[in-house]
């Protein structure tokens, strides 16, 4: 513990807050090009084939982002928009692909939570 005199001389240095989504550079969304689209398995108690894409962003950073919803049309060279938001059971996946924007189609036959999956209102 510092003495009063040490605090008078130096003072306390506030800690810097570290960003959870550094590749976004303070932007709400970023555009990028898929370099690889593949499936991966989640951490221990869960079991599935989660769809993810490696995306090269406009700032030249490569990130892994999750493709939400059932079915997708993404392949290599697809242009996507990503947002922040990690996937808890996939280590290293800190971003989500936005559905229904640019080359990504919305989820087909989606009735609830449509806005999150880029699905149009059913007739």
Curated annotation (Swiss-Prot):
**Could you tell me which residues belong to the region Disordered?**
1-29
Q: Does the keyword Kinase apply?
A: no
Coiled-coil ranges per the record? none
PROSITE patterns in the record: RIBOSOMAL_S12
* Keywords noted in UniProt: Methylation, Ribonucleoprotein, Ribosomal protein, RNA-binding, rRNA-binding, tRNA-binding
A GO BP term here is: translation
Cellular component terms per the entry's GO annotation: small ribosomal subunit
Q: Which residues, if any, are the signal sequence?
A: none
- The keyword rRNA-binding is assigned to this record: yes
- CDD domains named among the record's database cross-references: Ribosomal_S12
* 3-methylthioaspartic acid carried by residues: 89
Q: Which SUPFAM superfamilies match?
A: Nucleic acid-binding proteins
Q: Where is the composition biased (Basic residues)?
A: 9-19
Entry's Gene Ontology molecular function annotations: rRNA binding; structural constituent of ribosome; tRNA binding
Q: Which PANTHER family did the record assign?
A: 30S RIBOSOMAL PROTEIN S12 FAMILY MEMBER (PTHR11652)
Instruction: Summarize subunit and interaction data from the UniProt record for this chain.
Output: Part of the 30S ribosomal subunit. Contacts proteins S8 and S17. May interact with IF1 in the 30S initiation complex.
Q: What does this protein do?
A: With S4 and S5 plays an important role in translational accuracy.
Q: Which family does it belong to?
A: Belongs to the universal ribosomal protein uS12 family.
What's the protein here called? Small ribosomal subunit protein uS12
The species this protein was found in: Erythrobacter litoralis (strain HTCC2594)
Please state the gene responsible for encoding this protein.
rpsL
């Amino acid at each position: 513990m510092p003495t009063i005199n040490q605090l008078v001389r130096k003072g306390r240095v506030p800690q810097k807050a570290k960003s959870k989504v550094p590749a976004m550079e303070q932007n709400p969304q970023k555009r990028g090009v898929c370099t690889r689209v593949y499936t991966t398995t989640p951490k221990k108690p869960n079991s599935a084939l989660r769809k993810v894409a490696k995306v090269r962003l406009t700032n030249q950073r490569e990130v892994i982002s999750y493709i939400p919803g059932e079915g997708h049309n993404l392949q290599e060279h697809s242009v996507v928009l990503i947002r922040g938001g990690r996937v808890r059971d996939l280590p290293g996946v800190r971003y989500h692909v936005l559905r229904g924007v640019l080359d990504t189609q919305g989820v087909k036959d989606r009735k609830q939570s449509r806005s999150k999956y880029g699905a149009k209102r059913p007739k």
